[in-house]
């Protein structure tokens, strides 16, 4: 077992690869909260919890340039890895408690995945009490910004990005229509998620935009 190996400390580079940890919550049908996660992330959580217990909260070092990139839940996951005991001292024993203190669910009209219409969508996407949250996180985080590192980055021609618009050709229009049909099937529950899903459609749509 891991305990029998005698490991008393771990250093994890590219720690963002372990952000996909399953979140258990009473909030239903809210985007940004995933109840499914990767096995490697669950394994990492168990190792971090064990090392934290035998080292009084020490012995774990994460290094990453993107601790948060997709959802607010990734902040909770990082804190769960690195400062679970500190959260529990504040009475935060689970995600819903953390979310009640530091997050908010918003509902807005959004374009559907396939781009054929609009629908109301609830998302966990707004921080509250952000200064307090950052003060807690900085107890374990040494944050280095690009300005602090003084990285040698080449200047962007023109000083800002240039948006190039193009009209869709017949092929792009045909694929977009196919996205609509696929999305309707997925929404109706007539497709196995392992065969087709909204994430797959979104990914293919991004590739289509690049190809256009």
What are these regions, as identified by a protein language model?
Residues 1-9, 40-73, 81-212:
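Inter-lobe coupling linker of SF2 helicases/translocases
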Residues 4-49:
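SF2 helicase catalytic motif II
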């Amino acid at each position: 077992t891991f305990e029998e190996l005698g490991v008393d400390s771990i250093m994890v580079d590219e720690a963002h690869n372990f952000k996909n940890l399953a979140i258990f919550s009473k909030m239903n049908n809210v985007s940004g909260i995933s109840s499914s996660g990767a096995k490697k992330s669950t394994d990492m959580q168990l190792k971090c919890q064990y090392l934290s217990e035998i080292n009084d909260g020490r012995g774990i070092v994460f290094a990453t340039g993107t601790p948060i990139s997709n959802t607010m839940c990734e902040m909770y996951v990082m804190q769960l890895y690195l400062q679970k005991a500190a959260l529990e001292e504040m009475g935060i024993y689970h995600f819903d408690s953390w979310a009640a203190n530091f997050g908010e669910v918003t509902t807005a009209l959004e374009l559907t995945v396939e781009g054929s219409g609009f629908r109301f969508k609830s998302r966990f996407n707004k921080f509250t009490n952000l200064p307090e949250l950052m003060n807690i996180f900085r107890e374990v985080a040494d944050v280095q910004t690009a300005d602090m590192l003084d990285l040698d980055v080449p200047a962007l021609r023109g000083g800002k990005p240039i948006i190039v618009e193009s009209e869709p050709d017949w092929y792009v229009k045909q694929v977009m229509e196919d996205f609509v049909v696929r999305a309707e099937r997925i929404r109706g529950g007539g497709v196995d998620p392992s065969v087709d899903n909204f994430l797959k459609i979104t990914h293919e749509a991004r590739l289509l935009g690049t190809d256009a």
